[in-house]
Amino acid sequence: MTRLDDTNWKDFIRSTSSLKKQLSERQPLGSVLSKTSAIMADYSRPSDDELESIGDSYRLMSEYMLRGFQDNSRADLYGKLVQRLYRKLTDVELQVRKQFDPFVRTLVPRDATRLDVDSLRNGLELFVSDLAMLTLEPEQKVAEKRKMLYERRHNIMSNAFNQILCSGQWSNEHANDIANLILSPIIETTDALSLSAAVMMSSLLSPDPVKVLLLLRIYKEATDEKLKQRALIGWVFALDNGDFNLFPNIRESLKPLMADKGFRDELVELQMQVVFCMSAEQDTETIERDVMPNIIKNQNLEV
């Protein structure tokens, strides 16, 4: 057995990535589960309740099948077990990166607990109401109190952003709570934009189908155009960052959108903007190297 450290954590990530690829290629779940257990043992990873639960459910399902029991929901159960293992492997990868990857390690917040959405909502709603109440304050106290309110709000949003950024796989319930907060008309639009950006960046750090669906929901339901565009960029980039073939609910959510020509045109425009951004630095270098010197030298240039 080998303990994970700064010298071998990338090998571990390559191993788990290979297992996820095997799941995406529809290789037998039992085989991938056995390999997962072996890799966890090889690297002295502690036992995990979720992995044990997946293994127990798979063995029970297999046992009933071998006994000849008919179960119309077996295929659906099998697919959900595959999804659970894929997401668990993604979570394990993130945990290892947070421990050993120098870049990711700098992003981990001091408060590593899961975001308390109710507490965040109360803090942001209180900011809006307190800001409105400033109109009743004496003029000489307004500036000082406004500064205090914005500092408190900055601390709240900074903590929330970092907690979302480094979070693992979300449950549907947690994602719905976040989405409801982002779409709430009570909080500031800038806060909603920041939270959407945090979800997007979290999805880029560690692919999560639930976060993709959250961003899709915000895109569909947001009334503010800036928030709508932020969500569009978020789910497009997040969707490109992971292998979501095992999650047909994402494909089903996209079907009605892709049937809309206006939406397809919007996607094409976004792709063009990305291409232009990618080539902007090269274009600048070309202008500075080839175009500007000729303009400077040609003093008789006629316009």
Question: Which residue ranges define each predicted feature?
Answer:
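Alpha-helical solenoid scaffolds in large eukaryotic transport, assembly, and signaling factors
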Residues: S119-A222, G234, A238-L246, S279
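Hydrophobic core segments within long, regular secondary-structure runs in both alpha-
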Residues: G55-R59, P209-L216, R251-K255
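Residue-level detector of extended alpha-helical repeat arrays and alpha-solenoid scaffolds
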Residues: A192, K228-Q229
